[in-house]
Amino acid sequence: MHCESPIKRRLSRKIWVGSVPVGGDAPIAVQSMTNTDTNDVAATVAQIRRLEDAGADIVRVSVPDMDAAEAFGRIKQQVRVPLVADIHFDYQIALRVAELGVDCLRINPGNIGREDRVKAVVEAARDKGIPIRIGVNAGSLEKDLQKKYGEPTPAALVESALRHVEHLDRLNFPDFKVSVKASDVFMAVEAYRLLAKQIEQPLHLGITEAGGLRSGTVKSAVGLGMLLAEGIGDTIRISLAADPVEEIKVGFDILKSLRLRSRGINFIACPSCSRQNFDVVKTMNELESRVEDLLVPLDVAVIGCVVNGPGEAKEAHIGLTGGSPNNLVYIDGKPASKLTNENLVDELEKLIRDKAAEKAAADAAVIVRS
């Protein structure tokens, strides 16, 4: 039951991606990207719906050619979450998906082409009320910047971004967000720090090509955590070579750890030792999988013994501390009941679900009164 985050967020301009606000005082949005063949409409729709169920605020879809653009239009009609079309090389694809109802256009300045092509995309976006993401990536910098800097650097990433920010400014188009991604944590972090000082637009954070589920999670948590703790960032994407649903889970876990956004159960659990009165690892693994469908924010402490157990349990909505002969349960900081190891997970799940329902009803009542 912790207080609000002490982080003071950078004040940015608010834009709208479909129905989702990004920037300003809006919650930090969590994004993912499909990894299906966009031309396989059924598979892509199915994956997007799984991402919706996992809590994705925005989903990006790669649109590599005109056939994929037509497929994108059919996909858009079958999902609820706002969709971003990821466009490279052919600006005409961006023009087509704008006609088909895209919620945001992501273009890469390094490969979209001449300024007149960027202007055409901007005018299409303006006509349809569609925001743009300028997506700069260390792996696809413009050739003149590669020659100037010799290799990708934070300064090169920022220079690439700023030249296209200035272009959109000249076209009087303010509704855009910017990313300056790299697979190197230090390069990405420094680029975002530099850029945050120079523009007012919202920033989309990510460590690109971060890696597999474990290594990518660690790299993203370190890089994005550094920036978010400094108040930088308005929307995030965790790039993992894994099921995209895992990106949403990790994204929300990062935000929860910084108290920037609460969604679902925040578990506090000990690593366990010989003092444990129940199998903490087994209990946690089973409990996490059972209640991952819950969206109500709750703190749940699962501590194996009485050394730190009572202290942690008292600070949670629901706390379990191991003890002999029985384990003690705290509800809202007060001792409530005792549980044996038999059916422990079943009993905890019921307590968590009951508490979640109670909190959801209380929150709804507050909204009605206000």
Curated annotation (Swiss-Prot):
Source organism superkingdom: Bacteria
GO biological processes: isopentenyl diphosphate biosynthetic process, methylerythritol 4-phosphate pathway; terpenoid biosynthetic process
Pathway connected to this protein: Isoprenoid biosynthesis; isopentenyl diphosphate biosynthesis via DXP pathway; isopentenyl diphosphate from 1-deoxy-D-xylulose 5-phosphate: step 5/6
EC assignment: 1.17.7.3
Gene Ontology MF term list: 4 iron, 4 sulfur cluster binding; 4-hydroxy-3-methylbut-2-en-1-yl diphosphate synthase activity (ferredoxin); 4-hydroxy-3-methylbut-2-enyl-diphosphate synthase activity (flavodoxin); iron ion binding
Co-factor note (free text): Binds 1 [4Fe-4S] cluster.
Residues at which [4Fe-4S] cluster binds: 270, 273, 305, 312
Cofactor(s) essential for the protein: [4Fe-4S] cluster
InterPro entries, sorted: Dihydropteroate_synth-like_sf (IPR011005), IspG_bac (IPR016425), IspG_bac-typ (IPR004588), NO2/SO3_Rdtase_4Fe4S_sf (IPR045854)
Reaction it catalyzes: (2E)-4-hydroxy-3-methylbut-2-enyl diphosphate + oxidized [flavodoxin] + H2O + 2 H(+) = 2-C-methyl-D-erythritol 2,4-cyclic diphosphate + reduced [flavodoxin]
Record's keyword terms, sorted: 4Fe-4S, Iron, Iron-sulfur, Isoprene biosynthesis, Metal-binding, Oxidoreductase
Classification via NCBIfam families: ispG_gcpE, PRK00366.1
HAMAP family referenced in this protein's UniProt entry, alphabetically: IspG
Function per UniProt: Converts 2C-methyl-D-erythritol 2,4-cyclodiphosphate (ME-2,4cPP) into 1-hydroxy-2-methyl-2-(E)-butenyl 4-diphosphate.
Protein family per UniProt: Belongs to the IspG family.
Protein name per Swiss-Prot or TrEMBL: 4-hydroxy-3-methylbut-2-en-1-yl diphosphate synthase (flavodoxin)
Species, as recorded: Ectopseudomonas mendocina (strain ymp)
Gene: ispG
